[in-house]
Amino acid sequence: MAGCRGSLCCCCRWCCCCGERETRTPEELTILGETQEEEDEILPRKDYESLDYDRCINDPYLEVLETMDHKKGRWYEVVKWTVVFAIGVCTGLVGLFVDFFVQLFTQLKFGVVEASVEECSQKGCLALSLLELLGFNLTFVFLASLLVLIEPVAAGSGIPEIKCYLNGVKVPGIVRLRTLLCKVFGVLFSVAGGLFVGKEGPMIHSGAVVGAGLPQFQSISLRKIQFNFPYFRSDRDKRDFVSAGAAAGIAAAFGAPIGATLFSLEEGSSFWNQGLTWKVLFCSMSATFTLNFFRSGIQFGSWGSFQLPGLLNFGEFKCSDSDKKCHLWTAMDMGFFVVMGVIGGLLGATFNCLNKRLAKYRMRNVHPKPKLVRVLESLLVSLVTTLVVFVASMVLGECRQMSSSSQISNGSLKLQVTSDVNSSIKAFFCPNDTYNDMATLFFNPQESAILQLFHQDGTFSPITLALFFVLYFLLACWTYGISVPSGLFVPSLLCGAAFGRLVANVLKSYIGLSHIYSGTFSLIGAAALLGGVVRMTISLTVILIESTNEITYGLPIMITLMVAKWTGDFFNKGIYDIHVGLRGVPLLEWETEVEMDKLRASDIMEPNLTYVYPHTRIQSLVSILRTTVHHAFPVVTENRGNEKEFMKGNQLISNNIKFKKSSILTRAGEQRRRSQSMKSYPSSELRNVCDEHVASEEPAEKEDLLQQMLERRYTPYPNLYPDQSPSEDWTMEERFRPLTFHGLILRSQLVTLLVRGVCYSESQSSASQPRLSYAEMAEDYPRFPDIHDLDLTLLNPRMIVDVTPYMNPSPFTVSPNTHVSQVFNLFRTMGLRHLPVVNAVGEIVGIVTRHNLTYEFLQARLRQHYQTI
């Protein structure tokens, strides 16, 4: 076991060992993933740690409940709602910060380059303009890539990682303050650097980090930031705040608080309740109105007007008053929308397939090399993107006549769109009174380009739209996955909007459907491609409706997204699920396949257990913790017929056997307890039965054998009984002897007990053992001490630890005959980390963990099942 690299929080021994792999940090493994040389598919890694979403109702927790009166309960709720509001406000301010500096850097870059292009168009020095554009873009991308080297998990959008976190997987470094700083600064440099990425996706990750860190009032990265805030010191509470923060991020990005709430439910959170719904919606509203308030005041000088609800504004869709035949959409258009949904699904599947191949190539050929290679790859993508943008605008663009409402302003043309939002059109390389349609799309911020496609009628030729779509599609696919913070929402929307606008132009010019509204088709195209890539339906429908502020678009958007999802699902998964799979994360889907019910809990559990006794010596606990990597241990006692002989003279064995007897509940014993509590007594016969069961036992002496087993590098388990000394010649019955199950205790709890000296001497009773409060047990959360950092010289190895007050005495359990679908539903819906399998007489026979419920593991077990039939 010393060579094991990690485990999926399970209590099995053999399944946690890994082969030798190259040395990488947990953060690098998280973002880079691992590949298998012989197999093309990437299986879930077993060294991911799960989160404790199940509440541990032990003695310290019950003591808290005893002191929790109505007033404290109300105060706790007030604090929780206040924290939720603060998360929303802070997420909105993060969005404001990113948007402000992205606009600042983008305006600086385009201002310098446009002035140079205007001057060099006449002097013939366009190469100088290209060098200036390259200088800006390469510098910004270089800074973004350096930030990812500082914190590798800051790369990408962060949505796959947050999805895994909310699913119950502990992703290293995903919600650190350092990750937030690298993400925020990195994404503004990525967008300002001209890469085909968006800032809206990383807002979800940023909001999640704010939600995770703000309620803790401390930081792992900056350890001096600590206020000893006593609340919300558990994974269960943090999960709810991360859900709220992620929703606040997308609400700030799109100005869609209801859609953001649904997004957190549909794509993110695996565990949900009614109270969380209100808190997530309130947090989303807080983020939306915070961002709206400050953006409206800064941009328009109209504080309190609330004119800009999100980072991405789609504007108002309406037909011209002079065009009486125009309609936003008609029933006849639904057929075109369905076809566009099919094409969007095909394009999305193609995008995902290409990006998956690129990601695998990077994992095999880029990531194993020195970190500088990842920076060079990012610079290469930036270089190619800049060259394509500049050359395409100069060579492939068409000079089109300005409309009468257009006017020249500082080398660009200002055009008032129907949504009352000013968007600039570019006159690059074109004579007076004309503009370059390709440059208008490439030399504008992506949000402005989307507005151009949504609201400008007849300003782009079909050839320009087709070329722009192909170039943007390929470059966006290549860009997603490089070592910079990047989002995928806006690139997918812009690429899809060009596709929809192309369809509208073809229908108008070549089929003669003059009544159609081009903006509607552009919106449907954007929805089709985005839905084909990310495969979301409900939340994306509401987000787009809220962004357009047009409820009549609800039906066509929903149908388009459904068709795009069905079409794409026929070929592959959504882009986020693909990247989750590439990282080997044991993500649990919503449900298992029907055929998995051919398996039972006994088929998938791990029977080879590492366990502890209710009373165990420090020497044994330290050895177990240092020689295994499991994150929880069953608390058990052994079933023997001659227990009285072994109790003589040994306090440790006596305490364990007494605990076992006291934990056995009988109907007669319960009736006696109830009768005594009512000042009445049962019959003498019933008393005799109970007295016989709880008869006192005499203790005996016994030798601790754990150190001998540890020296032999073989630890089946420290056996307390002298007639069964550890031996490699044990029979199967001896190795898997019956064990009565009493509860579960976590590794973090055991280490905390050892660090704080919670133990008692063999010459004393267990009542003399110091007691820890709930606050003391959770004080080191979320970074509990490591057993290897423990100073063993401060511990007496012969002292005994009573773990019973701190274990979870009533975890969820299943019987060996429980069908896999029932095991899966219980594990997933209750947010479990470990699921003991207990037989009909209360003996633990195995443990089910997250790894045992992954699709790949179940498929392997199903194949074995078919082979044994």
UniProtKB/Swiss-Prot annotation:
The chain crosses the membrane at residues 81-113, 128-150, 176-194, 200-217, 277-294, 335-364, 371-392, 462-481, 487-511, 553-571. A motif (Selectivity filter part_2) lies at residues 198-202. The record marks 267 as: Mediates proton transfer from the protein to the inner aqueous phase. A motif (Selectivity filter part_1) lies at residues 156-160. Residues 1-80, 572-869 are cytoplasmic. The keyword Lyase does not apply. The modification Phosphoserine is found at residue 773. Residues 605-662, 807-868 form the CBS domain. This is H(+)/Cl(-) exchange transporter 6. It comes from Oryctolagus cuniculus.
